[in-house]
Design a protein with these regions (language model features):
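N-terminal Sec/SRP start-transfer signal
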Residues: 1-31
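Alpha-helical transmembrane segments of integral membrane proteins
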Residues: 20-31, 256-276, 310
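Small-residue transmembrane helix packing/gating motifs
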Residues: 55, 82, 91, 166-220
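Short coil/turn motifs that cap or connect alpha-helices
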Residues: 14, 147, 298-299, 309
Length: 310
């Protein structure tokens, strides 16, 4: 009882110093946690990727679409279990500040390929039968207060116009790594609109998602798919889903390196603050420590007291 009481009394010998030291350490730890969370969030999509899925896109750039007819040829490649496709939509909900990902998908094949998107059978069926239907992640629905049956208006950017979707389902993630901030709707709805306004852009998609029979065949299947469309008007680049996600991370690699560097600097700051506090405490109490040693207290006890008070 004597030692804790002694430590407590000496802690408040300099109340302001103790308060500022504690506050500095709390801020530093909170900053480190926030910075590491940002870095982890950047890699979340890649970490949640499946080894059994490939992504096929234009070899020139992701902004160039691929003909939908490629789907049938990809299905015929040995080792391919199924094929789906998706388009980035890029709509605006009310204002530019309300950003969230939106994808036009082939619902039957896409949902079958992503079992980690957990949705009830009733909501899945309602989504499949409603051409203007959409599903969103739980976090996104909670953020905007949406519930099943609501109407979601989006202002198109890549695909101009006002788009209205009926919320038919809210999906959860099979685990915490699954993104729950995305909206999915019918690719056919988007394609029909494009064919009316820009006929030459119809029946094209941004990416194909390829499900493998055996993940070990990823490299072989990727090479075969790209060889199939070599020397065509729209050559392809096929890579694992994780590699595809990491390609987006690579675009902002300099920012990530800077954030990681700052997070480690924060650790150094924490250690410097603690070392400075310990040094100040020890210097101020040399006489007291000498007296305690003269009274018979050992060096280990005095050292422990310094650490506890710091």
């Amino acid at each position: 009882m004597f030692v804790p009481l002694l430590v407590l009394r000496n802690l408040f010998r300099h109340k302001l110093r103790t308060l500022l030291t504690a506050l500095g350490i709390v801020v530093a730890i909170a900053s480190f946690g926030l910075l590491r969370t940002v870095v982890d969030a950047w890699y979340a999509g890649a970490n949640a990727s499946s080894a059994a899925r490939l992504v096929t896109r234009s070899s020139v750039s992701l902004v160039f679409p691929l003909p939908l007819t490629y789907a049938q040829k990809i299905r015929q490649v040995p080792g391919v279990a199924s094929v789906s496709w998706a388009n980035w939509f890029g709509g605006i909900y009310i204002s530019e500040r309300n950003f969230f990902p939106q994808f036009a998908i082939d619902p039957q094949t896409y949902l079958a390929m992503y079992p980690e998107l957990v949705i009830s059978d009733a909501e899945r069926k309602a989504f499949l039968v409603d051409r203007q239907g959409a599903i969103v992640g739980r976090k996104l629905a909670d953020q905007y207060g949406w519930k099943v049956g609501d109407t979601i208006p989006l202002r198109g950017t890549i695909f101009p116009g006002t788009w209205t979707f009926n919320l038919r389902g809210i999906y959860d993630g099979a685990d915490k790594t699954v993104d729950q901030t995305t909206m999915f709707f019918h690719w056919n709805l988007l394609n029909e609109s494009i064919k009316r306004t820009y006929p030459r852009r119809g029946d094209q998609t941004g990416v194909f998602i390829v499900e493998l029979k055996d993940p070990a065949q990823a490299a072989e299947v990727s090479e075969t798919i790209d060889a199939t469309f070599a020397n065509s008007l729209a050559e392809t680049l096929t890579e694992t889903e994780k590699a595809f996600q990491l390609s987006f991370v690579a675009m902002t690699e300099a920012i990530l390196v800077a954030i990681q560097a700052v997070s480690f600097v924060v650790i150094v700051i924490i250690m410097a603050v603690m070392a400075n506090t310990m040094a100040m405490t020890a210097r101020e109490r040399y006489a007291e420590y000498a007296t305690m040693k003269a009274l018979g207290f050992g060096a280990a006890f005095v050292a422990g007291l310094i650490v506890a008070e710091s």
